[in-house]
């Protein structure tokens, strides 16, 4: 049975980009879950936080238990969120407390502190790469592929999205990703949007049995999740990669960090 949809609220005292990226990176490890994301940025006062708490209460009345991912550092605002009928994930609090003990001083805990970093250029580059990855995720925005550093290609649920987001946030790499579908296999050639960008393509493959397990969690009993379909798609994708001369990385037992490291090494080799 497919699990019911869960609402994920991204709550921040600033833009929410940091909170959303971290939340998506964590939740990408649970592909069977059906999730709806709601962004609630600039929650910098108790009054605004109470409004978010009321929204959560309304969801709870319908039988849902929302998830809140937050980078709020103001204790009074945080208390309002923690009182709401939701599972709250404090993305900064535990780390700040540990650092306070380590350094022997209190954290500044000012609104948007992360965005006042000395290395503003690096931060802006990562946020730009993140915006690009989200805008060109899962085949979207293919007209922007000319601006990409790398385009990840593979069948559905091979690990393209979490790898793209990791490359963007950790390495400022503009990573797009494109899902291969049956129409592409029938053509026996690269999808038209990818043709002009062969040098940027990097294939991701996966063991069909592992793919079957992942898809079964998401859509049990469907043709999409059947082992036969998974074997067919992986086989056809690998043939396509071979014909096009695209470098390929197996994601079956690799972490996102390991996949990204291999792609970065390939990019450095040119």
Curated annotation (Swiss-Prot):
Membrane spanning stretches: none
Keyword hit for RNA-binding: no
Keywords: Kinase, Nucleotide-binding, Serine/threonine-protein kinase, Transferase
One Gene Ontology term of the molecular function aspect: ATP binding
EC number(s) given by UniProt: 2.7.11.33, 2.7.4.28
Pfam families referenced in this protein's UniProt entry, alphabetically: Kinase-PPPase (PF03618)
Signal peptide start-end: none
Catalytic reactions of this protein: [pyruvate, water dikinase] + ADP = [pyruvate, water dikinase]-phosphate + AMP + H(+); [pyruvate, water dikinase]-phosphate + phosphate + H(+) = [pyruvate, water dikinase] + diphosphate
Binding annotation for ADP: 154-161
InterPro entries given in the database record: Kinase-pyrophosphorylase, PSRP
UniProt superkingdom: Bacteria
Transit peptide is among the record's keywords: no
Purpose: Bifunctional serine/threonine kinase and phosphorylase involved in the regulation of the phosphoenolpyruvate synthase (PEPS) by catalyzing its phosphorylation/dephosphorylation.
PANTHER family in alphabetical order: PYRUVATE, PHOSPHATE DIKINASE REGULATORY PROTEIN 1, CHLOROPLASTIC
Family indicated by similarity: Belongs to the pyruvate, phosphate/water dikinase regulatory protein family. PSRP subfamily.
Protein known as: Putative phosphoenolpyruvate synthase regulatory protein
Provenance organism: Deinococcus geothermalis (strain DSM 11300 / CIP 105573 / AG-3a)
């Amino acid at each position: 049975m497919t699990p019911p949809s869960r609402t994920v609220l991204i709550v921040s005292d600033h833009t929410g980009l940091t909170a959303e990226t971290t939340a998506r990176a964590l939740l990408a490890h649970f592909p069977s879950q059906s999730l709806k994301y709601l962004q609630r940025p600039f929650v910098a006062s108790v009054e605004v936080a109470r409004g978010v708490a009321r929204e959560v209460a309304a969801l709870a009345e319908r039988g849902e238990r929302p998830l809140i991912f937050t980078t709020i550092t103001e204790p009074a605002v945080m208390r309002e969120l923690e009182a709401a009928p939701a599972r709250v994930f404090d993305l900064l609090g535990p780390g700040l407390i540990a650092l306070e003990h380590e350094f022997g001083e209190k954290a500044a805990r000012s609104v948007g502190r992360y965005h006042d970093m000395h290395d503003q250029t690096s931060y802006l580059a990562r946020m730009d790469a993140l915006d690009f990855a989200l805008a060109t995720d899962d085949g979207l925005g293919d007209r922007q592929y000319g601006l990409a550093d790398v385009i990840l290609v593979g069948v559905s649920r091979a690990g393209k999205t979490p790898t793209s987001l990791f490359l963007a946030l950790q390495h400022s790499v503009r990573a797009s990703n494109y899902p291969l579908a049956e129409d592409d296999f029938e053509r026996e050639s690269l999808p038209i949007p990818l043709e002009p960008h062969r040098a940027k393509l990097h294939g991701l493959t996966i063991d069909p049995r592992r793919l079957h397990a992942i898809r079964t969690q998401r859509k049990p009993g469907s043709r999409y999740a059947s082992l036969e379909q998974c074997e067919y798609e992986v086989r056809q994708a690998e043939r396509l990669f071979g014909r096009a001369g695209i470098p390929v990385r197996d994601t079956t037992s690799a972490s996102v960090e390991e996949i990204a490291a291999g792609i970065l090494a390939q990019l450095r080799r040119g």
